[in-house]
Amino acid sequence: MSTALSPLLAPMLSSAAMRAACDDRSTLQNMLDFEAALARAEAATGVIPAAAVGPIETACKAATFDIAALAEAATRSGNLAIPLVKALTANVAKADAEAARYVHWGATSQDVIDTATMLTLRAAIDALDADLSRAIKGFAALARNHRNTAMVARTWLQHALPMPFGLKAAEYAASLARARCRLRRLSRDGLALQFGGAAGTLAALGDKGLVVAERLAQELNLPLPEAPWHTHRDRIAEAASALAILAGSCGKIARDVSLMMQTDVAEAFEPAGEGRGGSSTMPHKRNPVAAASALGCATMAPQLAATIFAAQVQDHERSAGPWHAEWPTLPQLMLVTSGALAAIVDIAEGLDVDAARMRSNLDATHGLIMAEAVTFALAERIGKSDAHHLIEAASKRAVAEKKHLREVLAADSQVTAHLSPEKIAALFEPMAYQGASQAMIDRLLDSLERD
């Protein structure tokens, strides 16, 4: 697996841990780990001599292989496993010609490559899990600290109702916790050994095929599937889906943060730092750089996942083409997902919330944001339809006369006949109209540790 990202761009669009998991040397080592484990499994089950294991294991070191030469040879063989096995066999033969006879015994190229992909995915999930836990913890802290910080809830980008910022932060944490849940389930149940031999029947191993497969799965600590899955790619598609969903969740958070950072909104800001968020020409700017990185990654992820989904349509017992499409695509999806998440970790752990500005923005529409609260209070006396028409007319007058809605209502005899001045004033306190928000915050926070 190549990182498929330019070295100039990779640090901005991926995490260091994911780059390490997906780089060529790690991929090669995962393939060699399969070969070493296969030798151990076959020796343990009496398929190959025990004496062959040591020389094979010793030769399974990625650092001793020429990656460029393997890549060039793969263009002629159709996949990387063929030249790798050839080179590995030659290296083993230098130390023990007899042991070299048993390299890759009974396996096929796809067994090597797919199992290496499973090992890469496992490392990738571990890396994502660590960052997810950090982001969840950060947003949970914001939710607790700002559960009584009133802000504008926006629908269709317009002021709608008041809400506590803590609810928004708790929703962020919960969406990431659900993503973590998916990935943990995938790591536990969705990854699996690939081992079927030339056509998925393990025919070369005679009656020892399933016994070797079971031991090989144990050696690699991977679940043993009921049968090989060479051209049934739902496992890969499920991984792509979980990754793309996580990237999308990160993108949603990043979109909100970038909008809250707008000069005219100014409710929250990414953490400040030397040289961070500046413009090449405008020294006053504080750009949403982490949000932009997350959004860029989240924009790429769906198309990458779509390629993986398209590659599910494979022919018979070995695919000519669609399988190849997975090789550069899946690692790039892992990388950009990690990049989106890394940016969100940065935001979660350092978001600067301006509670005073949030309150100021609530007041910017001169009470119109509380129109629903007044409508429902009045509806208890005169019915919802009449209350709606009355408050709608009052809201239009408030806008036309440039007055606070509270002032207009206090002067309206149709309203004061049913609501006292004190009641009207109380209805314009944003945190008095938050519905089940506090209970929702608690429920969301309680859900964070579920697997």
Swiss-Prot record:
Keywords: Aromatic hydrocarbons catabolism, Isomerase. This is 3-carboxy-cis,cis-muconate cycloisomerase. Belongs to the class-II fumarase/aspartase family. Catalyzes an anti cycloisomerization. The keyword Transmembrane helix does not apply. It catalyses: 2-(carboxymethyl)-5-oxo-2,5-dihydro-2-furoate = 3-carboxy-cis,cis-muconate + H(+). It comes from the Bacteria. GO terms for molecular function: 3-carboxy-cis,cis-muconate cycloisomerase activity; lyase activity. Its EC number is 5.5.1.2. SMART domains: ADSL_C.
